[in-house]
Amino acid sequence: MVEPLCNKKAAMIFQELKVECETLFEFKIRNAIPIHRGWLNLKWKLETDAGSFVLKQYNKERYKMYNQELLIQALQQQQRLHNNGISCPKLLTYKNNVMHISKNNERFIVLEHKEGNLISPGKLNEKEIYSLGKAIGQMHDLLNDGSLIEGEKPKFVPPTKENRLKHWEDKRREAEQLGKEHILSHIILQQEATQLVNIDQFYNSKKGWVHRDLWVDNFLFHNDEVSAILDFDRMDYDYVELDIGRAVISCALHDGVLNKSLVASFLAGYRNKLDIPVGSIVRAIQMLWYMESTWWIHANMDQHSVPPSRFADEMSWIAKNYGVLQKMLADL
């Protein structure tokens, strides 16, 4: 397990990166405010004589988990999206590099600071979610315009039904051995939903370059419009519907109810740029669940912090409604 850095170490890293930034980008940092969001990577809002920016340091241990070539490609694509009018922050470059390395081998990026507000899961209004759908459609269109070579195979490889059922049986046994009766119902729910899965339909889903982390913490909104799509670090070649399912569940599910009019508004925005067949949102949500459920539902889920707890709730909701999603959303 990679541990977060202590405040003293973080302060030392900032002092080093402050000097680097002022040298590379020829601005003077007047104030720096830590941003306490994200896992392990350090972030600060910089107020400078050239405007406001965000400094992001890549944790050395976490960086080892990245495919480094894909990460650089993702940052370069973020820059291309920005240059083509998509709402995502511009990166400051030095000698055409989007990522920079300090004397002590700290990797970092500097982005323009985008104005806007975070909105809680399921709390978007129809104008906001329409704007988001439109921006994601434009993003998917640009990422797959031929500038990038098509990936060899999607990142997500759906396991067989038998493998997944065995997984849930193992988790069920683990919860029983730990005496966690309160978690058993969540695991049994996943088992029951898995019985309904048709794996073949997932393979028919369109493949392409996608963001892979489209949840509310990575969106900013201003005046009923999306002002920023953030954090392209996980961008990869995958099933396009996974992006759609992730955004819809994050933005339209609230208090155990999926707001159908919000889902419709998102899809209307998306179709402003790209076609998505009527009813395919059902498969998008089902496939999202098949990919993510094992990440969030397990014997130790009672120790989740707030975001994983929300994701676990989403997975439980999809599992509970897996068989009725078709009836609920087939006309969208």
Residue ranges of each PLM-predicted region?
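ATP-binding pocket architecture of kinase catalytic cores
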Residues: 48-148
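An alpha-helical support segment within catalytic cores of ATP-dependent transferases
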Residues: 16-24, 147-150, 164-212
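ATP/Mg2+ or Mg2+-diphosphate-binding catalytic cores
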Residues: 5, 295-332
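Active-site acidic catalytic loop and adjacent metal/ATP-binding pocket
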Residues: 39-47, 54-55, 91, 194-242
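A cross-family kinase active-site recognition segment
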Residues: 122, 126-180
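Active-site activation/catalytic loop segments of kinase-like enzymes and analogous catalytic loops
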Residues: 241-275, 290-306
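Conserved NTP-binding catalytic cores of kinases and kinase-like/nucleotidyltransferase enzymes
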Residues: 1-88, 92-93, 331-332
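A glycine-centered beta->alpha junction motif in the catalytic cores
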Residues: 60, 108-121, 171-173, 290-309
